[in-house]
């Protein structure tokens, strides 16, 4: 299957630059895997499509303010760090701009020296392994000095950094938000639970690979980035009980979907687990757990639209995207949502 089969025309004006004032007032396109019709709703209508006994799986990761701006020691040259992955307490894999100034042994400082860093080694795709030096708690310094790592297609400054977090975010570790979850409010979640729908939390720390384009012509040759995930015994039990009872499991976002499918057995059960996954889901994949998906509208030729196509079918997905463009849906991280039942 070719990468360019997932291309489509998207006007720049449809790329949402800011979140809506009310999270759940985004539009919702509803699609049935077994029908051709497309229904246009708002996100707060989502309870109409969930039944008592269904299970909603949310990703409770929290985005780190992972962009650091500092200077190179001795020269004072301006530098930007983007934290990618924690290796141990003080050691991280980071992207550095400009990279040519970040040779092994180079030292940098942030916040007038309250945080320092030294390049230890080179990593894949131009990244560096860096050791940080500081007093106190690293996360508190990051909260003080760091900025949110917004996707490259968002060019406007974010007024409130909490709008790039889900209301249920808990465990810090992501370089990007699980954006399907941005539409939920505490009130909407309460309404969903009152209807008898189980809401289960899993964790997958989203990496920047989410935004990396597929650079190969054939999907079979694409290698996904690895991301860390955790599913507790309690979460696995609720999901397995849902399937056993003949009810549906909905993933909130592609990250929740990939976590579920990574932790599934051939017999269609979820096992409690923690580890790294690089699962790549594209048309032809047989889902073992997932029955439905809540997701945003994604980039052309991205692994995310390929995952949606695996569930909905490629032609149906591209047709839905054409309708979304014609109806002027808002796209990408701060955009509107799609529900597949």
Curated annotation (Swiss-Prot):
One of its GO terms (molecular function) is S-adenosylmethionine:tRNA ribosyltransferase-isomerase activity. One of its GO terms (biological process) is tRNA wobble guanine modification. InterPro entries: QueA (IPR003699), QueA_dom1 (IPR042118), QueA_dom2 (IPR042119), QueA_sf (IPR036100). Pathway: tRNA modification; tRNA-queuosine biosynthesis. Keywords: Cytoplasm, Queuosine biosynthesis, S-adenosyl-L-methionine, Transferase. It is an enzyme of class 2 (transferase). Gene3D superfamilies: QueA-like. It is found in: Cytoplasm. Coiled coil: none annotated. GO terms for cellular component: cytoplasm. Its EC number is 2.4.99.17. Pfam families: Queuosine_synth. It catalyses: 7-aminomethyl-7-carbaguanosine(34) in tRNA + S-adenosyl-L-methionine = epoxyqueuosine(34) in tRNA + adenine + L-methionine + 2 H(+). Transfers and isomerizes the ribose moiety from AdoMet to the 7-aminomethyl group of 7-deazaguanine (preQ1-tRNA) to give epoxyqueuosine (oQ-tRNA). Monomer. Belongs to the QueA family. This is S-adenosylmethionine:tRNA ribosyltransferase-isomerase. It comes from Alkaliphilus metalliredigens (strain QYMF).
